[in-house]
Amino acid sequence: MTRRYWNINLEEMMEAGVHFGHGTRKWNPKMEPYISAKRKGIHITNLTRTARFLSEACDLVFDAGSRGKQFLIVGTKNKAADSVAWAAIRARCHYVNKKWLGGMLTNWSTTETRLHKFRDLRMEQKTGRLNRLPKRDAAMLKRQLSRLQTYLGGIKYMTGLPDIVIIIDQHEEYTALRECITLGIPTICLIDTNCDPDLADISIPANDDAISSIRLILNKLVFAICEGRSSYIRNP
């Protein structure tokens, strides 16, 4: 895999608060190689390591994007949800930003059935057929459509398992990460100082609580995906 330059700037990361970890009492000893200092009771992440692994992740997604691979971005906590949706839409990726439904990947046949139902209901609403049903039936189906939109709206065009999954916050999305590990799907995971760096294929040590930090990491990955996709379009 060719290494590229992704304009990953340490000063920019500091301004975004990427280096701020969790309190020193809430840490995983496996994160010690990625921590540079303790300050006012919190761990400080070594941004040189962050830059290295973020660059590796950008190389990976560029390469995958240039070969037409499919991505899924997962981040369901409030601080990540909007950034995840924005990044995924910008890079034409699938995403989950509300709630991870257990078995979403490992029980793909059930997810596929739900997606078919979701698409059918969307079509019925679009054509006006829902409004021609008895009020009680229409109301029930509209509630069902609303729930499906909330939980599956970001994967409505997904027709199979993703090739790479990008995860924001290992603790919050542990179920999603375990499903990827079970299925052998490569993962890129943003990890804070309380996480296990050994679980993902590429772990990016960074603040997973600050919106500015999450957005910066996603910006770099999305740019690399878009660059890869444009390369794929030029050289199919």
Curated annotation (Swiss-Prot):
Signal peptide: none annotated. Keywords: Chloroplast, Plastid, Ribonucleoprotein, Ribosomal protein. This is Small ribosomal subunit protein uS2c. Pfam families: Ribosomal_S2. It is found in: Plastid, Chloroplast. Belongs to the universal ribosomal protein uS2 family. HAMAP family: Ribosomal_uS2_B. The lineage of its organism: Eukaryota, Viridiplantae, Streptophyta, Embryophyta, Tracheophyta. GO terms for cellular component: chloroplast; mitochondrial small ribosomal subunit. It comes from the Eukaryota. One of its GO terms (biological process) is translation. GO terms for molecular function: structural constituent of ribosome. Its main location: plastid. It comes from Coffea arabica (Arabian coffee).
